[in-house]
Each structure stands twice: as structure tokens, then as C-alpha cells.
């Protein structure tokens, strides 16, 4: 009561405030009634609509902010919103027919064409092409044919033939790849932004990639399968580099990753990661985090290629199928969330037929678009 005996003026609480949302519930109700004048509209319909729109807006703004950050821009533009929508599968399906003003367009490049352009410059193609050329020159019957066609044409033909072989291998999921320097490319998959995933049958210590991944424990133990292989190939220099890293870094936490120089190895760097044990608390999330941390370290060094073993499926006890699914899921989501990545090729270095079959099968399930 006021001093004059009248009632206090009570401030009206809006429907949005009552529902706990920011978007205007009353306006949503008017929009729904305009479109459906013959139907009765429930009280909860505009509230639910406002909540959904608010959630979608926040999601798009978060992804657009990540795109602006990755492109080193301080302000979110319509272009970043377009990229955010295009790189999220659900949002892309929802807003497929929506035009974003001043957002530009996304080039519709077929993944195979993109892979050919990048593959001709990549290290893997450079490794694959020499052996067939040597085989073609070694027989006495094929030498005059090479002279007639010319060096450049012969090289182009050999590249085309090898491309057909690799495509057949990836399509049929067989072990008929292109054998080169002790390893065979069994299957290739291109992701949305052009990164290539390749299943390779070989020893991880023999591949000439920018980085190889070494699954270890908190003390940087090198007694596992991958650690033993790298230690034999790298020798004392590799062991000393690991010891120095252990002193500088200290114990390696679960899902953590640290990098050292690849002394004595074809690879430039070795990324040591501490993967979780199967059955531990949140082991699946931690395995995904382990893979993403390895990729982030490679991106920090501006590396273009990285080779993974089957992390977690050895002594840590992960089922091979589960480990493959989690690793591929982590890699795919990493490249979607990180708009600008220096990594162009990811190798999976496998040696047993069971792991090879699982990775080829799981890679075929990934959507290249």
C-alpha cells in the first residue's frame, strides 16, 4: 500500500522472463497465429520455439566465433557464419536452402579432384611414383617405348595408372595397393576440407612423414611395440631425445601429448601421447582428447603430415573396432572445429589384417562431403 492508500504499481513480467528465455515469446505466438489461424495454439508452443531459436543462434555464433579466431579475425562477419553452418552437418542440413547475405559462396569441388591436385604435390605421391618408373625402365623391352612416348608423357601415364590402382584399392577395400619402399597404401579417404586419410601397411618407423605418434605412459616408456620399433630405428639419438623431453616436460598426464625431434628416423618429429586404459573412467572421451592433442601439436609446428598407429588397442586393452571408431571420430571433428589446419595427410600405420580391415571399413563410413 502507498501513503495515499492506493495499490503499488506492479511491473509486468514478460512471457520470456517467465519462461527463462531471451527471445520474445509473445512475438513468436503472433507469428504462429498468423501462419495457422484455424488452429488452437498451445501455451508452450511459442516458448519451445523461442528456446530452440535461441539455442540455434548461440550454436551458430559459437562456431562462427571459432571460424573468425582460426582465420585470425577480431570480428565475426557473414562469411564466418556461412563457414560455421557449412562445417556443421546438422546445421548444414537445416539451413541448406538459406542464403546468408554477404556471406559469399562455398566452392563445390569434388573430393577426388581436390585430392588429385594436392596429392600431386604431397609427399606420399612423391614416394609412390618412383618405383613404377624404375620398374618400367628396368626391362629391355620397355626402354624403347619410353623413348618414343617421351619422359614427361611416360611419367603422366604412370601417375594415372597408380591413381587407378589406389582408387581400386580404396573402393574394394583389398590389400592390392601400390608397394613402395616397404609399405603399401591400402585405402584413401578425403574429408570435407580436403584432408586425406590413408591406411598404410608398414612399419611406422619407416614412413617419411612430418611426425609419427608414439603411444607411451606417464614416464615416456619406450618398451611398447611402437616404442621398440622407433628405438631400434632411431638408436641412441632417439633415446637421448626422449630422456631430455622427460626432464623438461615431467610426467605426461593421461590424454596429454609432447613432441620431440625425430633423431635417426625418417620423420622430423615424434609426438608422444599417454592414451587411457580401457575400462577407466571416461576412457572413450580421453582417447578422443589424446588424438586431438596430437593433431594440435602438429598444427602448432605447422606440420603437413602425421602418422598414427592404432592407439589404445595394444596394452591399453581397447577393442580394435572401438579404438578405430573413436580415433576417426576425433580426427573428423578436429578438422571440422579447426577451420585452418596445416595438416593435409593423416596416415594410419597398421600391420595386422584385422586392424587393416577394421580401419578400411570404418573409413568407408565417413562422409566425404
From Swiss-Prot:
Q: How is it modified after translation?
A: Monoubiquitinated at either Lys-116 or Lys-117. May also be polyubiquitinated. Ubiquitination is mediated by the CUL3/SPOP E3 complex and does not promote proteasomal degradation. Instead, it is required for enrichment in inactive X chromosome chromatin.
Q: What is the lineage of its organism?
A: Eukaryota, Metazoa, Chordata, Craniata, Vertebrata
Q: Which organism is it from?
A: Mus musculus
- What is the tissue localization of expression for this protein? Widely expressed, with high levels in testis. Present in liver, kidney and adrenal gland (at protein level). In the liver, present in hepatocytes and at a lesser extent in cells of the bile ducts. In the kidney, expressed in proximal and distal convoluted tubules and in straight proximal tubules. In the adrenal gland, present in inner cells of the cortex and medulla.
- Phosphoserine-modified residues are 170, 173
Cross-linked residues for Glycyl lysine isopeptide (Lys-Gly) (interchain with G-Cter in ubiquitin) are 116-117
Q: Where do Basic residues bias regions lie?
A: 144-160
One Gene Ontology term, aspect cellular component: nucleosome
Assembly state and interactors?
Answer: The nucleosome is a histone octamer containing two molecules each of H2A, H2B, H3 and H4 assembled in one H3-H4 heterotetramer and two H2A-H2B heterodimers. Interacts with HDAC1 and HDAC2. Interacts with SPOP. Part of a complex consisting of MACROH2A1, CUL3 and SPOP.
Q: Where in the cell is it found?
A: Nucleus; Chromosome
Name of one Pfam family that matches: Histone
Q: Detail which positions bind a glycoprotein.
A: 203-204, 226, 275, 312-314, 316
- List-wise, which residues carry Phosphothreonine? 129, 178
Sum up the protein's function in the record's words. Variant histone H2A which replaces conventional H2A in a subset of nucleosomes where it represses transcription. Nucleosomes wrap and compact DNA into chromatin, limiting DNA accessibility to the cellular machineries which require DNA as a template. Histones thereby play a central role in transcription regulation, DNA repair, DNA replication and chromosomal stability. DNA accessibility is regulated via a complex set of post-translational modifications of histones, also called histone code, and nucleosome remodeling. Involved in stable X chromosome inactivation.
The residues covered by the Macro domain are 184-367
**Where on the chain is N6-methyllysine found, per UniProt?**
18
The location annotated for the cross-link Glycyl lysine isopeptide (Lys-Gly) (interchain with G-Cter in SUMO2) is: 123, 167, 189, 320
Know the name of this protein? Core histone macro-H2A.1
Read off the PROSITE patterns from this record.
MACRO (PS51154)
Q: Which residues carry this modification: N6,N6-dimethyllysine?
A: 123
Q: Example GO biological process term? A: negative regulation of transcription of nucleolar large rRNA by RNA polymerase I
Tell me where in this chain the Histone H2A domain is found.
2-117
Q: According to the UniProt record, list the residues that bear N6-lactoyllysine.
A: 7, 9
**Which molecular function term from Gene Ontology is one that the record holds?**
structural constituent of chromatin
Could you say what the effect of mutating residue 224 to E is? Answer: Abolished ability to bind poly-ADP-ribose and inhibit PARP1
Question: Matching SUPFAM superfamilies, A to Z?
Answer: Histone-fold, Macro domain-like
Spell out the residue ranges making up region: Disordered: 128-180
Indicate the family of this protein: Belongs to the histone H2A family.
Amino acid at each position: 500500500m502507498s501513503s495515499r492508500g492506493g495499490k503499488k504499481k506492479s511491473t509486468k513480467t514478460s512471457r520470456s522472463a517467465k519462461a527463462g528465455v531471451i527471445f520474445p515469446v509473445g512475438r513468436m505466438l503472433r507469428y504462429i497465429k498468423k501462419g495457422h489461424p484455424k488452429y488452437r495454439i498451445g501455451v508452450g508452443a511459442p516458448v519451445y520455439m523461442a528456446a530452440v531459436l535461441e539455442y540455434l543462434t548461440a550454436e551458430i555464433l559459437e562456431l562462427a566465433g571459432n571460424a573468425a579466431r582460426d582465420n585470425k579475425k577480431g570480428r565475426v562477419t557473414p562469411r564466418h557464419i556461412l563457414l560455421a553452418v557449412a562445417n556443421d552437418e546438422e546445421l548444414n542440413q537445416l539451413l541448406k536452402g538459406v542464403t546468408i547475405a554477404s556471406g559469399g559462396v562455398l566452392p563445390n569441388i569434388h573430393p577426388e579432384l581436390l585430392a588429385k591436385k594436392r596429392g600431386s604435390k604431397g609427399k606420399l605421391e612423391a614416394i609412390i611414383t618412383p618405383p613404377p618408373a624404375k620398374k618400367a625402365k628396368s626391362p629391355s623391352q620397355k626402354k624403347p617405348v619410353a623413348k618414343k612416348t617421351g619422359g614427361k608423357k611416360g611419367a603422366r601415364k604412370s601417375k594415372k595408372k597408380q591413381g587407378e590402382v589406389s582408387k581400386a584399392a580404396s573402393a574394394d577395400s583389398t590389400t592390392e595397393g601400390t608397394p613402395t619402399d616397404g609399405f603399401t597404401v591400402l585405402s584413401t579417404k578425403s574429408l570435407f576440407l580436403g584432408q586425406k586419410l590413408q591406411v598404410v601397411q608398414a612399419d611406422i618407423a619407416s614412413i617419411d612423414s612430418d611426425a609419427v605418434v608414439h603411444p607411451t605412459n606417464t614416464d615416456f616408456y619406450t618398451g611398447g611395440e611402437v616404442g621398440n620399433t622407433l628405438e631400434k630405428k632411431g638408436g641412441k639419438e632417439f633415446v637421448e631425445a626422449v630422456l631430455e623431453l622427460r626432464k623438461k616436460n615431467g610426467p605426461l598426464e593421461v590424454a596429454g601429448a609432447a613432441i620431440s625431434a625425430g633423431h635417426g628416423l625418417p620423420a622430423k618429429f615424434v609426438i608422444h601421447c599417454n592414451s587411457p586404459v580401457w575400462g577407466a573412467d571416461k576412457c572413450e572421451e580421453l582417447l578422443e582428447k589424446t588424438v586431438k592433442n596430437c593433431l594440435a601439436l602438429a598444427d602448432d609446428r605447422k606440420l603437413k603430415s602425421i602418422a598414427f598407429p592404432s592407439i589404445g588397442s595394444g596394452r591399453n586393452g581397447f577393442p580394435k573396432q572401438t579404438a578405430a571408431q573413436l580415433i576417426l571420430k576425433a580426427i573428423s571433428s578436429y578438422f571440422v572445429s579447426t577451420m585452418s589446419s596445416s595438416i593435409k595427410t593423416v596416415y594410419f600405420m597398421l600391420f595386422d589384417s584385422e586392424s587393416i580391415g577394421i580401419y578400411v571399413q570404418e573409413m568407408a563410413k565417413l562422409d566425404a562431403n
